[in-house]
Every structure is written in C-alpha cells, then in structure tokens.
Amino acid sequence: MSHEGEEDLLEYSDNEQDIQVDASKAAEPSELDATTAEDASNGDAEKKGSYVGIHSTGFKDFLLKPELARAIIDCGFEHPSEVQQHTIPQSIHGTDVLCQAKSGLGKTAVFVLSTLQQLDPVPGEVSVVVICNARELAYQIRNEYLRFSKYMPDVKTAVFYGGTPINKDAELLKNKETAPHIVVATPGRLKALVRDKLIDLSHVKNFVIDECDKVLEELDMRRDVQDIFRATPRDKQVMMFSATLSEEIRPICRRFLQNPLEIFVDDEAKLTLHGLQQYYTKLQENEKNRKLAQLLDDLEFNQVIIFVKSTKRANELTKLLNESNFPAITVHGHMKQAERIARYKAFKEFEKRICVSTDVFGRGIDIERINLAINYDLTTEADQYLHRVGRAGRFGTKGLAISFVSSPEDEEVLGKIQERFDVKIAEFPEEGIDPSTYLNN
C-alpha cells in the first residue's frame, strides 16, 4: 500500500485461495426471543438474552477461558448463532476472517469473544484495535467488551472518536494505569493519534473492522485505515464484518487479509430478516406527516425509529411530533458529541419511545426494544435500506418496517431493493395489519 498524505481529522458518521463456507444451506434459525447488550457501564450487564441459535453446540464447546465462559452464562447465552458457530472455532486461533451476515445475528460477539480469548494483557500495550464508522457504534462495541470481560479485571478497554478533546485521549494513553489493551475507535481519531505519535500500535495482535464495507468504500476513510494498518505489526490477525459485502468491495477487503476464512451467512441475494414484516405506502410528499401520525396512533410498538434524509428534516419532524403529543428524540451527526451520546443512551434506556434519525443510526446500533422502523424518507441505496430496517426485529425477534414512497425515484429504489434482496415488499393495507404478525408474544 502506498503511503498517503496526512489528512486532518474527519467526521464520517453522518453521510447525507480462500476457505469459503456457504452457510446459506444450513437449517433456518428458530425464532427465539432475544435481547441485546445493555450498557455495561450503567450496571445493566446482568440482562439476560439469547442469540438466534440453531446448533446443539453450546458456547462451552468452544473451550473458552473460564472467565469468558462465566460472563457468557451471566448474559444468558447458551447456544451460538449460525455465524458464531461457523466463525469462532477458527477465529479464536488467529485465522483471518471476512464475514458477511445479516443484521442481528451476533457478529459483534464473534470478534469480542475471539479477541478476549487470545488476549494476554501487558500493562501499557495495545493488543486489539477495532475500527468502525460511527461513534455510537464504537461506544456500543466498547460496552460489549466491558460485559464479556467482567471477570477479567486486568483488561482495559477505551473508545476514541472525533468530537472530543484529543488531549484527554493522550492523557489516558500515556498513563500505564489507564492505558487500554483494547482500543475501539473511528478511523479519523485513531489516525490522528497515530500521526501525532500519541498511541503505540506496535504490539497489536488483532485488527478488526466492523461495518467494513462502509469503512472501506469511502476513499478518505480507507486512507486513514491504511495509515493505521501500517502502524501495526505485519504478523497479526485481521477480521472484517458487515451485514452487506458487495462483489465490488470484497477485493478491497481482501487486500488486508491473509488466507482468510470467508463466511457468507445467507447469499447476498437473499438478505432477508427473519420475523421482520416489510411494507411500503404510496403517498404525496405533503401527506407524509398525516400518515406518520396515523401510523403512530394505530400501530402497537415498543419503540420506533424514523429515518429521514437530512439533519434539517430530523429537527423539523421531531419538533412537529412533540407539538402533536408524540414525545420524540432526535439523533444526527451535527449535534455536539456529548448531546448525541446522551440522547442515544436516553433512547436505549427507554426514556423516549420515538427516535427520529439520519443514517447515523442506520448501521449496527442495537436497541432491543425497537420493533418498528419507518422510512419517512426512503434511502437512495438498497444496501442502506437493509441496515435501516435491520434496527427492528433484531436477533430473530419480530418487527415491522414501513417505507414511504412519494416520488418516481422512490419507486425505482423500491424496485431495486426487491430485486437486490429477492424479497416482495407489499403495500401497507388501508385496514392495517394484525399486531401478532410483528409483535412478540
């Protein structure tokens, strides 16, 4: 890889012969109720949950460290999901991994458990680097490390992202008492820390990119990742994960990998979400607000996420909803970092049931109570549609997704989505639908 010029710290998160395993032939997952990780730092690590498991194999059969096995039991996990079953046995032994599996099947746990299994913490040395595209996702991954390392008191994890003072990161890194063994970061901030020689990555043994297609498809972000990658040893494990991996992005991913295990759980053409009901409704642009209010009145839901195309529309729609007695919160990339994280936590902790968001919440964010996703503004990309609606119906639980179609461009995108994922999206019936089709018992 050629050495790229140094760039200023950028914000990315709000964008307005290989071993191959074909897991698509495996048995269909059973639909088990599930909950995702709660914020470990808030003392919610004892919440119980279960990934959609289809194998009689238990996590105990992976022969993990006793400390890890105990944390897994505390979380209520017994059987691995399909992607975990196919990946963990080799990833814990240092094999490079390229993994595509639909939203909600526990990809995060694959690299969290695999890296913790291999970790032998040395004070002051960074052993694991995890890169992701969004600050909220970095925060969430950090919390997964916290809950699975709860019985590994010597292990320290830190998260670094833009929008916070870099001198605070520097202070944490230079103090051996606080220096992390595991770093979760967005590319821009980590590149800046490397550039300014504030972090030493010469001891890294595991290099992970989550949502790798999003991280590597943008040239500026890819350059930052390359600079970070060059600061790590040549001999290390590299793992990449995403819900979508197009044929075009796979060769770019493979440049970072050596003889990888390639896992594709469900063929790309069939990236459907078990238990998720998908509909569209045709309307004029000026009818969207009335229709949204009607849906929020008529539908039964725990929490709903409403996707819009811009920060301005997010703010305006949230204001309108609150004025109409629909208490709502908004999250987008243009608000101050502390406010954004606070709102994310408030929504996750069920302080509000309605969240209006740009695509900053469109990838990887796990909030287990969301069972309704509404595309107020339909995305322009088929892959992004999957990431958006994947916020509902996580881990095989039921959910409902409704997309507003208000223009010929929207109709064209809807057609591409159905063709891309080999799925039929029906028009939402005027009389509504039976709540039992999208609500768990």
From Swiss-Prot:
Extent of Acidic residues compositional bias: 1-19
An annotated GO cellular component: spliceosomal complex
EC number of this enzyme: 3.6.4.13
Record-listed ATP binding positions: A101, K102, S103, G104, L105, G106, K107, T108
Residue ranges annotated for the Helicase C-terminal domain, each copy included: 291-436
Every Helicase ATP-binding domain range: 88-263
Annotated motif Q motif, positions: 57-85
GO biological process, one term: mRNA processing
Source domain of life: Eukaryota
Region (Disordered): 1-46
SMART domains to which the protein is assigned, alphabetical: DEXDc, HELICc
Domains: entry comment: The Q motif is unique to and characteristic of the DEAD box family of RNA helicases and controls ATP binding and hydrolysis.
The name this protein goes by in its record: ATP-dependent RNA helicase SUB2-1
Species per Swiss-Prot/TrEMBL record: Vanderwaltozyma polyspora (strain ATCC 22028 / DSM 70294 / BCRC 21397 / CBS 2163 / NBRC 10782 / NRRL Y-8283 / UCD 57-17)
